[in-house]
A protein has these predicted regions:
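A generic local structural motif
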Residues: 5, 28, 125-127
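Short, intrinsically disordered, low-complexity terminal segments
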Residues: 1-7, 19
């Protein structure tokens, strides 16, 4: 049985004033974040994410910038107002086979790194859930010393992502 909101807030406050386990405390603080963030792998040179929250396009662009790279290519796939012969589309709903999305993205990045060894930073982020008209559903970013490798790798990644990732 759930207490009234005011009583729950008071209980939560008291719980924080006594000794609480890290798990108990993190659940109350991180609950909304865990609900919106499904899966992320992020390192110095790879950022893969499946998220129910809006994608951080500008953060991805800034992250991909490297002092040894003269090119950063960022592709954003947005929700448009038509799909095939359907017009008046206002939103899309994405579902994912979550356990397989990030491992598949890792494999695609490995393919790209073999084909274009000069690429440095690679990001592939995709939304789940409702994505409104004009919002980003997917972001791919690649940085490289030269634009030809960055463009080619980014095009390869988005094409393979759309064809093979279980979304």
């Amino acid at each position: 049985r759930r207490a009234a909101p005011q009583a729950w807030e008071a209980t939560r406050w008291r719980r924080r004033t006594r000794s609480v386990s890290p798990i108990e405390d993190s659940e109350s603080v991180l609950g909304p974040l865990i609900d919106s963030l499904i899966r992320v792998i992020r390192s110095d040179d790879t950022w893969l994410e499946l998220s129910g929250a809006p994608l951080p396009v500008e953060d991805v662009r800034r992250w991909a910038i490297r002092p040894d790279c003269g090119a950063v290519v960022v592709f954003c796939g947005t929700t448009r107002d038509h799909a095939g012969d359907r017009v008046g589309v206002t939103e899309l709903h994405y579902e994912a086979y979550e356990a397989h999305v990030v491992p598949r993205l890792e494999a695609l990045v490995a393919e790209a790194r073999i084909a274009w060894p000069a690429i440095r930073a690679v990001a592939a982020l995709h939304r789940t859930g409702k994505v409104a008209l004009g919002e980003e559903a997917v972001v791919v970013a690649v940085s490289s010393a030269h634009r030809s490798e960055a463009f080619a790798a980014a095009a390869h990644l988005i094409d393979r992502l759309k064809a093979t990732v279980p979304l």
